[in-house]
Regions:
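Outer-membrane beta-barrel signature, preferentially recognizing the C-terminal barrel domain
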Residues: 416-418, 670, 736, 765-824, ...
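Short loop/turn motifs that connect adjacent beta-strands in outer-membrane beta-barrel proteins
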Residues: 34, 168-175, 204-209, 315, ...
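Short acidic/polar hinge/loop motifs at secondary-structure boundaries
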Residues: 118-147
Length: 1021
């Protein structure tokens, strides 16, 4: 049973009840009650639950629903948080807020979300939108279609989410209401406003013309503090064990590190490479970039909805609607890390003697400077004591203790807008009913990403992960304070050998981007009622959609002159700095020269520390010794421009440069045509009413992609060396077309008036992510090797869509108007799906007969998922007053991946988990709704799940998220005589946190999104 006003659809609402059964509130009556009250909080939760139940019983396939009254009584501020209450829905959260949902284990990109019949558009490269853009105050109802009927737009393999906002002719009387609240986040220690205004009337100027305006403004502060072990890899042998960490069958007979000296090879270089491959078997796992991060977001959100409806005639109603959502965000990211990406960062033994054919060895880490557990995972270590020159005497390149500590700071705007324009009509012609809609939707994202990075040299840092959470605790020498900005400009710090450690100047970056997603749609639906003992209605319709995805990420990829390798200017800017006592010049290209005095003054001016609550406030089981604050350089343009030329830190070159348009990072033009016909069934079988439908949907998809085609060659030079040069860089265009026929069958058997059995079978599809379709191609022709194919990375416009067959049965019992008990089983067979980052040989990339070795997304086949869902709700009306106001709702879902056909790229073994699928999900809620008091306490839980199939930054391992459970609550005191309510609500009462990990020994990220409180007042006239 969904956590909110939701119950599994099992029976038609017009089913006749037995004489002594309480009569439920039908959908129309319940929604009239809600509308008459003109206040989504004042209306009782009980009536809303009854309305939601009836709404689902009337649906033509298996549906869960939430109505607006019930949403408003939840502690939810966006659609995603409300959807988490639905059976089988698993919510993805970012900064504590719901962003997207998996439905029955199917990832967000494969679920369709509609707002008033229009696709929710996203400008972030995927098909899943961000639920944070739409406030729940705008919403009238949400329907989650888990089954499929052919009158639904295809695209939701997991399910289809239909969001409907309020319409003016739904009102019976004029409406004017406002809500003012303040919200607090415990980690940010700020109070920010949230304001809602709603006004509408069913009669505006003339009879039949209705207007409704709904506006919500919210100023949201969010913050997440991360403790991270990132970039897990095997760089060196820390424990000197003879047990292999990962065995290589090519070197099965070499059972010690020292024995690898005998591997040999045809040349010294080959022998060294072979010896390293042998020694790698003994390398231990260690995080090479342990770090602390604090990410702060200030997000000013505006959601506005204007709806007009006009009753032209008793049988003809037209409408027009505009919805605008704006998010103006300021992102402040502080990343504090220790660089362990080279073996010189550790304290090393002398290298072993050269082996067969001169093959050299990689030095082992000194015993006593680290600890390693039984699974060959490093749990603590000490970094290098001195700077190590890995360059030459003439051109030194310092490593070891040099520049080992770094801090990066971003402080930039990130704005997202979406706009939806819809218009249409409903025309009733006796037995023929026609619906027509036209729409235009557009989403844009503009990013002004910048960065300042500084580093410094520190000797002998201890990193200890031997704690319950496995997270790094940094211990620095006594003279180094990570919360003091001045440590970055200290020119006197020395290593253990007494030599002064080098100091490095700052690096600056600017990475602008613009992206948009536009959809135009025409949609026609018709119902024709007929007299027939079995078929009650024929439904048919057609749809045409045109969608354009485009993104620009700085550009500069067009090769203007191959002879001189002159490229188009890029909007990206990268500056480095050199500190010299007496620099001969201020600037050489993108390198700037500053004096030690200038650098110290700069750090003094831009140095700062984190605000708000102490670092890692609220994080459960955090070990002692982690810092409460860290120092960082502010990206202060006024100060930085006194040294650096920041005139290019703008959007001027993002779209065009050198008189030519930039090649987009991706451009996908997609056209979709669809049509359907469906017969509605209404008959009797053995005295039991049988309703349902059977239909067929035809759809055709045409994709055209534009990206970048870069051709490079590695060749032998005249002096016998090798060089890699770019031969060409140009636009690449590839297209693809595919057609599908999607049958669907739904049946609903009323065994008794209170007991119904539903069944569903359907085929459905979901289209690949636009970024997977982009023909971005980067090929290398290595002419120094004979008999080998060119190697390319590329998008894959030839990707087949996700195609699935689904089955479901559901049994539901409605003993009275307030009670529902439901049990269902479902199965999904994904005939084709998409696997990212697969390397294949023999690929005819350009369809010209020439084959390449290509790393790209490819299709996988044959995944099989199933699950069991159970839900229930009731109101304790049988209890004596005042306890008759109590009620409960709850649901539980068990889901499994029977077969995934996925591979763990790190081990080569089978990957049994399916992305986004939690084995268990459950919701529980208790509410009280009577008189002046409305209160609810809600808990949402999901067990651990696979979040990433392959993470290249962490040894190609899959990444998992730990189980999470969130407790939310709200109390409303109602004073209808005075037309106002007051409320207090809290999210994440239990201070839940998130953890990303590879396995129990190898955590990646641990972070806490904070606990949020709202205090507010609602008034109604």
């Amino acid at each position: 049973m969904p956590f909110s006003a939701s119950a599994q659809t099992t029976e038609s609402a017009n089913q006749e009840k037995v004489q002594d059964s309480p009569k439920p509130v039908d959908r129309k009556t319940a929604e009239e009650i809600i509308t008459t009250a003109n206040d989504i909080v004042v209306v009782g939760t009980r009536a809303s639950l009854q309305s939601a139940t009836t709404r689902k019983r009337e649906a033509n396939t298996i549906v869960d629903s939430i109505v607006a009254d019930d949403i408003a009584s939840f502690p939810d501020k966006n659609i995603g948080d409300s959807l988490a209450r639905i059976t089988g829905v698993q919510l993805s959260r970012d900064f504590g807020e719901g962003t997207a949902v998996s439905i029955r284990g199917v990832e967000p990109d494969l679920n369709r979300v509609e707002i008033n019949g229009v696709s929710q558009v996203s400008a972030t490269g995927g098909r899943a939108g961000d639920f944070r853009e739409l406030a729940t105050e705008l919403v009238k109802s949400i329907d989650v279609y888990k089954g499929y009927a052919v009158d639904l737009t295809e695209g939701g393999i997991g399910g289809t989410v239909r969001v409907e906002t309020r319409k003016p002719l739904d009102l019976k009387d004029p409406l004017l209401t406002g809500v003012v609240s303040y919200q607090n986040l415990d980690t940010a220690e700020t109070w920010k406003p949230r304001v809602t205004f709603v006004a509408g009337t069913p009669k505006f100027l003339i009879d039949g013309l209705g207007v409704l305006v709904n506006v919500t403004y919210s100023d949201v502060d969010t913050r997440q503090d991360y403790i991270s072990n990132t970039n897990w890899s095997r760089l060196a042998d820390f424990d000197h064990s003879t047990e292999k960490t990962v065995a290589n069958p090519l070197y099965a007979n070499y059972n010690t590190y020292e024995s690898c000296a005998g591997v040999g090879g045809a040349t010294t270089a080959t022998a060294t490479a072979n010896r390293l491959a042998c020694e790698t078997q003994f390398f231990d796992w260690a995080p090479t970039v342990p770090r602390y991060r604090s990410w702060v977001r200030n997000d000013k959100r505006l959601s506005a909805d204007l709806a007009l409806q006009y009753q032209v005639a008793p049988n003809f109603r037209a409408y027009g609607q505009v919805q605008i959502n704006k998010r103006n965000q300021n992102l402040q990211d502080t990343n504090y890390s220790i660089d362990l990406t080279r073996i010189e960062r550790f304290n090393l033994d002398p290298a072993l003697a050269a082996g067969a054919n001169g093959g050299t060895s990689r030095p082992q880490v000194q015993l006593g400077t680290s600890t390693v557990n039984e699974n060959h995972v490093v749990t603590s270590l000490q970094t290098a004591l001195n700077a190590v020159n890995i360059g030459s005497v003439a051109v030194p390149n310092w490593n070891g203790a040099a520049n080992i500590v770094g801090v990066q700071r971003r402080d930039f705007s990130y704005d997202q807008d979406s706009k939806y324009f819809t218009g249409g009509f409903r025309w009733d012609l006796d037995r023929l009913h026609i619906d027509f809609m036209g729409s235009h939707a557009k989403a844009t994202t503009v990013s002004e990403s910048n960065l300042i990075s500084i580093g410094t040299s520190v000797s002998g840092i201890t990193i200890d992960r031997d704690n319950a959470q496995g997270i790094p605790v940094f211990s620095f020498p006594s003279e180094f304070d990570p919360a003091d900005p001045a440590v970055y400009s200290d020119f006197t710090r020395t290593g253990a050998n007494g030599q002064v450690l080098p100091v490095y100047g700052p690096a600056l970056q600017y990475r602008p981007s613009q992206a948009s997603n536009t959809e135009d749609q025409l949609k026609f639906d018709a119902d024709w009622e007929i007299d027939h003992p079995i078929v009650s209605k024929i439904e048919f319709g057609a749809q045409a959609r045109r969608q354009n995805y485009v993104s620009y990420n700085g550009g500069g990829t067009r090769l203007l002159d191959p002879a001189t390798l002159t490229y188009q200017q890029s909007a990206n800017v990268s500056f480095t700095s050199q500190i010299q006592n007496n620099p001969a010049q201020v600037r050489d290209g993108n390198t700037w020269y500053i004096t030690p005095t200038q650098y110290q003054a700069l750090i003094s001016s831009i140095g700062g520390t984190l605000g708000g609550a102490p670092l890692f406030t609220g994080l459960k089981n955090a070990p002692a010794g982690i810092p409460s604050n860290i120092a960082f350089p502010n990206f202060d343009a006024d100060v930085l421009s006194q040294i650096y030329d920041l005139s290019g830190f703008d959007q001027d070159l993002v779209l065009q440069a050198d008189g030519q348009p930039q090649i987009p990072a991706y451009l996908i033009k997609e056209k979709v045509y669809a049509g359907y016909i469906m017969a509605d069934i209404d008959t009797e079988v053995l005295g039991m009413r049988l309703t349902g439908n059977a239909g067929l949907r035809w759809t055709q998809t045409k994709d055209e992609g534009v990206g970048t085609n870069i051709s490079r060659v590695t060749r032998t030079t005249a002096t016998g060396g090798t060089e890699t040069v770019v031969l060409a860089a140009q636009e690449a265009r590839i297209s693809n077309t595919y057609t599908d026929f999607l049958p669907a069958f739904n049946a609903n058997l009323a065994i008794t008036p209170e007991l119904s059995l539903r069944a569903n079978y359907a085929k459905n599809l979901a289209r690949p992510r636009p970024t997977d379709l982009v023909p971005n191609i980067n090929c290398l022709d290595d002419q120094t090797l004979t008999g080998s194919e060119d190697v390319c990375t590329a998008g894959n416009p030839d990707l087949k869509p996700y195609r699935a067959d689904q089955w479901e049965v559901n049994l539901a019992w409605y003993p009275n108007a307030d009670t529902t008990i439901s049990l269902g089983y479902y199965k999904k067979y994904e005939a084709s799906f998409v696997i990212p980052n697969v390397t294949r040989s023999g690929v005819d990339l350009f369809h010209d007969g020439i084959t390449y070795t290509v790393r790209q997304s490819v299709n996988g086949y044959g995944a099989l998922l199933d699950g069991i869902e159970a839900s229930g709700q009731t109101v304790f009306t049988f209890l004596p007053q005042p306890f008759d106001g109590f009620g409960v709702t709850g649901n539980i879902t068990y889901a499994r991946a029977i077969r995934t056909n996925l591979t763990n790229s790190a081990t080569g073994g089978e990957l049994k988990e399916y992305p986004g699928l939690s084995k268990f999900t459950y919701n529980a809620s208790v509410f009280y709704d009577k008189g002046f008091l409305n209160a609810r306490l809600s808990y949402n839980y999901r067990s651990k799940w696979l979040s990433t199939v392959l993470d290249a930054a962490n040894g190609n391992n899959p990444l998992y998220r730990k189980a999470e459970g969130y407790l939310d609550g709200k109390i409303t005191l109602r004073f209808p005589k005075y037309h106002f309510n007051v409320f207090v609500e809290m999210q994440n009462i239990n201070r839940e946190y998130s953890k990303v990990y590879i396995n129990k020994d190898m955590p990646v990220d641990l972070y806490y999104p904070g606990r949020r409180m709202f205090i507010g007042l609602q008034a109604k006239l």
